[in-house]
Amino acid sequence: VKALDGVSFTLERGKTLAVVGESGCGKSTLGRLLTMIEVPTGGELYYQGQDLLKHDPHAQKLRRQKIQIVFQNPYGSLNPRKKVGQILEEPLLINTSLSKEQRREKALAMMAKVGLKTEHYDRYPHMFSGGQRQRIAIARGLMLDPDVVIADEPVSALDVSVRAQVLN
């Protein structure tokens, strides 16, 4: 089964690219391929001139730091055993040499940017509404200050009244 065939695009810095199509056409698969969550069976994938399909540790590290994804289901994408602070700090722990205090400061700053309160830092995902969980997922996707954020229907699971608020 071919999920994607003949897909080609260039994303310019500072621009938004929307991939539109009917259910099952491969939009989510494309997002997972771009982040290498799934490995392409063919084709090419370049980021800033680097072939991301080569098994080059530098290219893999670059991809992890500069290309992030926000999944459409915040219920399934947040580890229920970790507190919000841990969830947000994890990308920094893996990809930077920041101290524990620096990671905490960055996590708290990002929480403020997405409209979460300081006291939410020590709470678990199940303690939040769908809109708040999606804000946590968005915050996690932005923690490494990526160049590219792939948003896989980031508000599809939310009530219409909450969608605009989360997107803003």
Give the location of each predicted region.
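ABC transporter nucleotide-binding domains
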Residues: V1-N168
